[in-house]
A protein has these predicted regions:
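A surface/extracellular/periplasmic glyco- and lipid-processing/surface-interacting theme
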Residues: 9-57, 64-205
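Gram-positive cell-envelope targeting signals
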Residues: 1-7
Length: 205
C-alpha cells in the first residue's frame, strides 16, 4: 500500500523586513546595514529618470529657481540598480539622509552651506566629482540622444557593496538607528480607518 501523504502546507519563508518600509524582502546581507540616499535630477530636460522605482523613500524638495530635486533612499544597499541622472547636493538633503544614518551619494554640491554641513556633521558621502569607487559614469545613449551633459550622469548601484568595502566606508548602522525607521502597524492587525471623507485635496508650494 502507498504511504499516506501529508496535506499540511509548508511553512512560509519569512525574509527580513526593510526598516524603511516595514515590508519583508530585505536581503540577509543588508540586515543592520546603512541605507543609501542618492541625489536625482527632476527637471523636464532630464526625464525620464531610471532606477528610482526601486527606492523605498523619495524626498522631493525645492532648490533655487523654483525647480525641485529628488533624493531616493534605498534600504537595501545590495539591490540598488543603476540610477540616472545624478545631481548635486544642497545642504538640507544630507541632513535628511543623516536622520536615517544613510550613505549620501551626489555629484557635486554648492560650496557654501553644503560644505559646512559635510564637515560639521561628518557626512559619509560618495561624490561623482572624484568618481569615488569608480561608481559614476555618463550614459552614452543619452548623450547620443542629445541630452545636455549634466543630465547624463549615472550611479552604478550594483557596484556599491564592493566599492564601500574598497573605500573603507562604514556600512553598519549606528546604535541609534537600529531597527525600524518608523512605527509600522502589524500587517495582521491593520488599523481601522477613521476620519471623514475628503472631497477635495489641495497641495501648494
Amino acid at each position: 500500500s502507498s504511504e499516506p501523504t501529508s496535506s499540511s502546507e509548508p511553512e512560509p519563508v519569512h525574509l527580513p523586513k526593510n526598516p524603511l518600509t516595514g515590508v519583508e524582502g530585505l536581503s540577509e546581507e543588508a540586515v543592520g546595514k546603512r541605507p543609501v540616499a542618492v541625489m536625482i535630477n527632476n527637471i523636464d530636460e532630464a526625464l525620464p529618470q531610471y532606477g528610482i522605482g526601486s527606492a523605498d523613500i523619495l524626498v522631493e524638495a525645492l532648490v533655487e529657481g523654483g525647480i525641485t530635486r529628488l533624493m531616493a533612499i534605498y534600504g537595501d544597499y545590495t539591490k540598488i540598480p543603476n540610477v540616472c541622472s545624478i545631481r548635486s547636493a544642497r545642504y538640507y538633503y544630507p541632513l535628511i539622509a543623516l536622520s536615517f544614518d544613510a550613505v549620501y551619494v551626489h555629484w557635486g554640491h554648492e560650496t557654501t552651506y553644503a560644505e559646512d554641513v559635510f564637515q560639521s556633521y561628518d557626512i559619509t558621502r560618495i561624490c561623482g566629482d572624484w568618481n569615488d569607487g569608480d561608481l559614476f559614469d555618463r550614459d552614452e545613449a543619452r548623450l547620443d540622444e542629445g541630452y545636455a551633459w549634466e543630465h547624463t550622469g549615472y550611479f552604478k548601484g550594483p557596484q556599491l557593496p564592493a566599492a564601500l568595502k574598497e573605500l573603507g566606508k562604514r556600512t553598519d548602522l549606528d546604535s541609534a538607528h537600529q531597527g525600524m525607521a518608523f512605527l509600522f502597524r502589524d500587517e495582521t492587525a491593520p488599523a481601522a480607518p477613521t476620519g471623514e471623507g475628503a472631497q477635495e485635496v489641495r497641495v501648494e508650494y
